[in-house]
């Protein structure tokens, strides 16, 4: 597993705005779109490519590259917080196929001090057929315990895609450790690794409930 913690100032600027309790709903969604787009381009930079020659309008040859992996991209969106985030990813990866997973936490069942016991109910899943040529990007802006992400990875891993990426904005140290131990073949792109999870399963310092802040 490779962990990419992206720390460009523009990314941290947008993240700081997202963390603030004073950001309005529309700006919150727009920032998730912006971050998704930039992270999408960062992912593209790691894809396989080949050198090619092209002919310019002036009849001369120019050397370039062709990123052939772009032809086989599948993005899986973890609803609902990932919706604007995936909108940004699709701006960087406009030919990607799209799947969705809808899940919810059963917060009333949470046990203090045992974040791994927070149950997750996956109540809808629609994912296109996955092949060994595919690069799969599972997108969830907030990864706390990693329970939903674990179920998403397990739903496609038996199809043996070429590679699996996780795209997020914030991931907790606990969720990161858990995913790295169970899925060492998955690469993770994020902007921040936050240190704590509270007994409701929210990341601290985090940015609150991303779904509620984006959609009310």
Swiss-Prot record:
Source taxon at top rank: Archaea
UniProt enzyme class: transferase
Single GO MF annotation: uracil phosphoribosyltransferase activity
Residues where uracil binds: 203, 208-210
Cofactors required: Mg(2+)
Record text on activity regulation: Allosterically activated by GTP.
Function per UniProt: Catalyzes the conversion of uracil and 5-phospho-alpha-D-ribose 1-diphosphate (PRPP) to UMP and diphosphate.
HAMAP family: Upp_A
Protein name (database record): Uracil phosphoribosyltransferase
């Amino acid at each position: 597993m490779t962990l990419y913690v992206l720390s460009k100032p523009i990314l941290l600027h947008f993240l700081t705005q997202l963390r603030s309790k004073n950001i309005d709903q529309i700006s919150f969604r727009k920032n998730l779109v912006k971050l998704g787009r930039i992270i999408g381009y960062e992912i593209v930079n790691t894809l396989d490519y080949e050198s090619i020659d092209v002919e310019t309008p002036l009849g001369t040859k120019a050397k370039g590259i062709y990123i052939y992996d772009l032809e086989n991209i599948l993005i899986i969106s973890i609803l609902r917080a990932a919706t604007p985030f995936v909108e940004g990813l699709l701006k960087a990866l406009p030919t990607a196929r799209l799947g969705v997973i809808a899940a919810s936490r059963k917060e009333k069942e949470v046990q203090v001090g045992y974040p791994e016991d927070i149950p997750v109910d996956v109540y809808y899943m629609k994912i296109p057929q996955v092949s060994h040529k595919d690069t799969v990007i599972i997108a969830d802006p907030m990864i706390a315990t990693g329970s939903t992400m674990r179920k998403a990875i397990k739903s496609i891993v038996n199809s043996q895609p070429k590679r699996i990426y996780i795209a997020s904005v914030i991931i907790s140290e606990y969720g990161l450790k858990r995913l790295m131990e169970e899925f060492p073949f998955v690469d993770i792109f994020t902007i921040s690794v936050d240190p704590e999870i509270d007994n409701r399963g929210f990341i601290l310092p985090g940015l609150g409930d991303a779904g509620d802040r984006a959609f009310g």
